[in-house]
């Protein structure tokens, strides 16, 4: 039998203190009935003897301490899951937001999930085609990987997220592919863009959308990514789907953590974020992966904006320690009109070697990737030298590298947000660009591949 407590002692920001409680558990769900009869929800954040600290999801505005009642429900925050969620839009707490019918659940699952036993994990090894050359060709995404996008304020990460969600697929696989998209603390304009883009392109048919808006309570932001990941785990490990989870913008999630931490008067860590930020982020990122004996998988692309474009800020810094690489968006490329403005040199996919090559992409993938990286790096150096010494100071080879660098940005990296390139098109485009350079400079590609793939009429001896 559930007890109802009228012993609310204090409300501070999103937190409520309830006195005289019995048999209450950490993370337990709470229903608060305020004096108007409105029901609000919260969860137990801390227990000390007979006192429970409750975190309110809908905020504390309008709560009268004397007229409020708290009921502890004996279970954690859960989400109702079903395959019928595909094609639907939900709010940050998993409630339908698209005026569609209520979901009839096949299961109700704890949003905190169950940690995957490291021994049960399967190593990521299958190529995921995003249709974006800068990712597919140079920083390959592998099924089961967690690969974040580091963006900056004002950069087009929303368009990139929508493009990946629309175009991503696993090659040579009969399994169903699904996208779980969670937007955390976004504006009305961004929410409208995502819903319209998914709907117009038909991508919504294979997607589940969770939308937490900027005017929703900050506490809800802490639950939204977990709602999305729990849904992804259900679709992947119980329905055998390949699930791509896109989380944007996790900077807003971390700001919500900092807000709750400050309300609890915890000792702050770097830049005011809680000392457990690393651990908390790990509870999200480590829910990606593959499990032995299970057909499905979860691949994660968390997107975060770096405050002041600072890679050493705690959020991107700690994210980089947990995840397997990063895709970095460049403000310089954005000003040049390169879309998407992916800076391939500091970007990295630590698992790319496992998802490319014969039988996965193409035999020449690794060699061309290395040569494109080297050529672009040398092209940037040549252009920097020309700025200092003048173009006349460059050798003929340096001029060709500078030409290659410009062509690489305009043709390879820049493709717009609607072009969907196959991996064959990406690799062939790479060869076309490499033909700008003298053949003697292509030292990272074995001769057999040069003979087979280098365009004969363009290559220079």
From Swiss-Prot:
Pfam families: ATP-synt_ab, ATP-synt_ab_N, ATP-synt_VA_C
Keyword rRNA-binding: no
Keyword Transmembrane: no
GO biological process: proton motive force-driven plasma membrane ATP synthesis
Gene3D superfamilies named in the record: 3.40.50.12240
NCBIfam families tied to this protein: PRK04196.1
Reported function: Produces ATP from ADP in the presence of a proton gradient across the membrane. The V-type beta chain is a regulatory subunit.
Family the UniProt entry places it in: Belongs to the ATPase alpha/beta chains family.
Protein's name according to its UniProt entry: V-type ATP synthase beta chain 1
Lineage: Bacteria, Bacillati, Bacillota, Clostridia, Eubacteriales
Gene: atpB1
């Amino acid at each position: 039998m559930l007890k109802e407590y009228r012993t609310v002692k204090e409300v501070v920001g999103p937190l409520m203190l309830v006195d005289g409680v019995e048999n209450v558990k950490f993370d337990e769900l709470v229903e608060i009935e305020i004096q108007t009869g409105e029901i609000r929800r919260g969860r137990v954040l801390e227990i000390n003897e007979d006192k429970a600290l409750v975190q309110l999801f809908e905020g504390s505005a309008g709560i009268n301490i004397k007229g409020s009642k708290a009921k502890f429900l004996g279970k954690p925050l859960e989400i109702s899951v079903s395959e019928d969620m595909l094609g639907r839009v939900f709010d940050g707490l998993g409630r339908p937001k698209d005026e569609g019918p209520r979901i009839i659940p096949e299961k109700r699952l704890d949003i905190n999930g169950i940690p995957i036993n490291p021994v049960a994990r399967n190593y990521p090894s299958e190529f995921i085609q995003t249709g974006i050359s800068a990712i597919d060709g140079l920083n390959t995404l592998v099924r089961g990987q967690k690969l974040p996008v580091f963006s900056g304020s004002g950069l087009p990460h929303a368009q990139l997220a929508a493009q990946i969600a629309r175009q991503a697929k696993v090659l040579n696989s009969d399994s169903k592919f699904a996208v779980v998209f969670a937007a955390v603390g976004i504006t009305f304009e961004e929410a409208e863009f995502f819903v319209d883009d998914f709907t117009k392109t038909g991508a919504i048919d294979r997607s589940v959308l969770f939308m937490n808006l900027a005017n929703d309570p900050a506490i809800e932001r802490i639950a939204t990514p977990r709602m999305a990941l729990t849904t992804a785990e259900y679709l992947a490990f119980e329905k055998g789907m390949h699930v791509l989870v896109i989380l944007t913008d996790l900077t807003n999630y971390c700001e919500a953590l900092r807000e709750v931490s400050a309300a609890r008067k915890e000792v702050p860590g770097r830049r005011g974020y809680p000392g457990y930020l690393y651990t908390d982020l790990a509870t999200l990122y480590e829910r990606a992966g593959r499990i032995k004996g299970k057909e499905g998988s979860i691949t994660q692309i968390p997107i975060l904006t770096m405050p002041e474009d600072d890679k050493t800020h705690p959020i991107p810094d700690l994210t980089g320690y947990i995840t397997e690489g990063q895709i970095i968006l460049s403000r310089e490329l954005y000003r040049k009109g390169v879309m998407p403005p992916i800076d391939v040199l500091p970007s990295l996919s630590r698992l790319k070697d496992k998802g490319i090559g014969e039988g996965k992409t193409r035999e020449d993938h690794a060699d061309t990737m290395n040569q494109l990286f080297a050529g672009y790096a040398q092209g940037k150096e040549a252009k920097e030298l020309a700025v200092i010494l003048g173009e006349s100071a460059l050798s003929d080879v340096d001029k060709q590298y500078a030409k290659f660098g410009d062509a690489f940005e305009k043709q390879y990296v820049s493709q717009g947000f609607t072009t969907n390139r196959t991996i064959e098109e990406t690799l062939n485009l790479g060869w076309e660009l490499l033909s700008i350079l003298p053949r003697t400079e292509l030292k990272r590609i074995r001769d057999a591949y040069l003979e087979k793939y280098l365009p004969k009429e363009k290559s220079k001896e």
